[in-house]
Structure formats: C-alpha cells, structure tokens
Amino acid sequence: MVESVSRRPTVAITGATGSVGTAVWEAFRDDYNLIGLTRSPVRARVNANSAPGIEWRHCDLFDPYAVRDGLDGADYAIYLVHSMLPSARLSQGQVADLDLLQADNFARAAEENGVEQMLYLGALVPEDTSDLPSPLRRRLEVEQALGSTSVPLTTLRAGLIVGAGGTWLRLLLNLVRRLPVMVLPSWTQAETQPIALQDVVRALKKCLGNPATHGATHDIGGPDAMSYHEMLLRTADVLGLERHTTTVPMESPRLSKLWVWLFGGVPWALVNPIIDSLRYQAQVQPNEMQDWLKRDALSLEEALDASVDERGQPLPNPRDELRPREDAVIRDQSVVRSVQRMPCPPDFSARDVADEYLRWLPRLGWPVLQVHVEHGRVAHFELRPVGTLLTLRFAADRSPDGRQLFFVTGGLLVDEDGDRSGRLEFRKVLGGKAVLAAIHDFSPRLPWYIYNTTQALAHLGVMWGFRQHLEHLSQQHTESALVSSSVQSSS
C-alpha cells in the first residue's frame, strides 16, 4: 500500500472543504495523493489523522509564504476558492480585490514549487465582456492572475452547478418550496445550462495531467439549455409540487434580490452576487470538452435527485458543521484585513509605489499627526504630544519582485501581545494595471467598538488619499506622454 501511494501524483486542492471541493476530493482520492489546503485551523485539526496519501494543511492564502509551504510537494493544483465569507474579524475591501490577492499568491507559489499544472473552475461569461457585473469580472481577474506565471493553467467555466451543499441550489429549492405563486421578472427568460456537480468533477479529472488542455479554457454545461423560468418549474416537478408562475415585463434587480433574500434562506452577502450573475445571459460555447461531457451528462432532474434527501431537502453543505467553531476562532484572533485597489502609474514597479508611499506620508496630517521616515525604509506615525502611534519597518528579505512588505513593529495603537505580526504590502497585479495595498493580521489595541469608528476609518482615509495621489501621478504621466508625442510629431 505504501509503495503504491508513493508512486501516485500529488494534487493540492484549495477550497477542498466546500461543496465542489468535497466532491473533487472523494473522486480523486483513489488515484492521487491529496493535499487539502484550508484556511481554518479547526478543519486542519479535525482532519489531521487521515489515511495514507491524504494530508491536510492549514494555509492562509493571504500569506504568500504559507501558500508556498502549502503547495510543497504538489504535482498539480486545483483552485476552488472565493472570498464570500470573512477571513478576519474586520475585513475592509471589495471581494474582487481579496480574490485577486489570493489568486496571485497561489500562482506565484505554484511556480516556485514547480507545479506542473493548475486547474481553475471559473464562471460562464457572455461574449461581450465590456459591461460585466462585479461577480463575473472578478472571476476573469482570477483567471488572469492564475495564468500570469509559467505554470500551465486549465480553466473550466461553468454556470449553475447542481450538487449537494451548493448555496445557490439551497436558494433554488427554498424559493420553489416556499412560493406557490411566483411573479418573475423578464430576465428569468434568459437561458442557462445548469450542470451536475458529478459532471464538473468528470471534466476536472479529464483535464488533470492532460497536456492537451494546458492553456485551454473550456465552457461546460449540462445536456439541456433552458430558461430560469423553465428551471424553476422543472425543479417543482422533481419536488412533487405544483407551482404557478407569471412573468412581468420589468428587470427590477433590486426587487429580485430582496425577494430572493426574504424567501431563499441565504445571507444577503451571497444573494447580491448570485442575482447579479444570473441576470447576464451566458451560453456554453461549443468545444471538444463539452462534446465529450454531454454524452454521459446528467439531466437537471437526475442532478437534483442526487442533491436532495428523501424529503426533498437540500443535502447539507460540508462546511456547515464546523462553521460556528471557525467563526469563534476568527473572533478570538481579533485581527484586521484591509485590501484596497489603486492605479499603478506607468513604468512604476512595486518598489516605486512603496517608495512613493513613504515620500507621500510625511505630508499627511501635519502639524498634529506627523510621519517621520528613517533612511527611506522605516516610518513612524507620531501624534503630538501623545507619542508614536505606529511604526512600519521595511522587510527587504520578504520583498521579491512585484511585492513590497512592511511589518508593523510597534506603536501605541498596536496590540503587541497578538499571535501574529501585522504587515502592510504593496502588490503589483494584472500585468501592472493596478496595485493592491493590503494590511494583514493587524491586532489593534483599541477596543473594537472604538477601533471600528476611529482607527479603521482613518486607515481607509489614508488609503483613499494615497490612491488619489497615484491617480494624479498617472494623469501627469499620460499628459507628459501626449505632449512629448505632439512635439515629436511637429518636429
């Protein structure tokens, strides 16, 4: 047994405890050695005593060194992560920026570890991507980040996935069960092509270790395209319920979200991106993977039957059982995460952005709040006559190309008894189009009810000011380039 396990390729799966990740895990465990990456120390402890060839690692995807260690020994890596749920007691920033930072860390770590292939399960997008809603746009950005290194990336794009534990499936079943009469907005006439979770897993398995799929992007879906309206009625048939519907000629996205939130039984934070995504029609484009998949694909009815119990209730999400304990850990850790996107001036490196930040800081808050910069690398935030509030110290040994890191090393506003060291980083992303300024694992000394209404807002104000400064520099560069071009043309 040990010998056969040692010969098998090793697959690292991040997002392995979610509904899709759990199905992938079960399908792959007989053929591969598996590394499950989880941000939850609770899950890492619960799953610690695994079978041969199975390993769980606690891995904070916001920490590039933790991700590097997490992917150590992996031949392949599957990325099934999104940031819909909080990872810190206070999280500031857009979900898109949190997702982008994690994907960038993952791609860099995969390259550093010599991973042979990455697989990513993304979202179907329409042919015209100029006006995408945020949920779809951020999935494309994750694709771009994962594909930015030398590691071959294979992307599968799916729409609605019908499987045990899925959030949107619970929403669908609750709506059908709770509403005998449904008044549907016009966007429910748009077509979708739901796919069974089992078929998603089949597609991932076919791609893994297959050089023909390197660098490829494939749309995948079930055997039938249907409108959302039809999908609701077919779901009612599976549940043995008679439902009446009428369609009204209006879009009403806000009303749709409110209606779904009231009757769908899922948090508002999840309703908002789900409805935004559903309203944009995206069809599965013909491709070889879809042709192969459709031959044995499950119908909507078969997929639903496999996803509910004998009473027609959705099977539980694998994460639900431990979530209260995970929330308690997040609260006990009491740290802050703040990620803000900023423009990157042309020809600026991450080092240039960090240097500009230190040059800009002394202008901040004068004369009451002063920032002194030592040797261009250490910043002291001082409040007269109180003393030093924060000290930022540049970490040269942890600042590779594209990333500049500062540790929070002291100050009156820092809880120095915390388990983690707070840090500020500037990360160049999306091919240099943007910079992410991120605070991680900062432990405030102020009581939380005071911190949230003072220091937390002050940090956002500082980041807003620096963003404006970078926008001004970008505009200056553009104007200078136009003037230079004009002079050259006239001469």
Region locations from a protein language model:
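N-terminal Rossmann NAD(P)H-binding glycine-rich loop of SDR-like oxidoreductase domains
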Residues: 5-31
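Mid/C-terminal beta-alpha module of Rossmann-like enzyme folds, strongest
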Residues: 9, 206-270, 281-334
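Oxidoreductase cofactor-interface core, primarily capturing Rossmann-like NAD(P)-dependent enzymes
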Residues: 19, 128-241, 258, 265-266
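NAD(P)H-binding glycine-rich loop region in Rossmannoid oxidoreductase-like domains
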Residues: 42-46, 50-113, 124-131
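Hydrophobic ligand-binding cavity/cleft-lining segments
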Residues: 298-301, 305-397
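Hydrophobic-ligand binding "helix-grip"
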Residues: 385-430
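Beta-strand/loop substructures that line and gate deep hydrophobic ligand-binding cavities in soluble
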Residues: 414-453
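A conserved amphipathic terminal alpha-helix motif
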Residues: 450-488
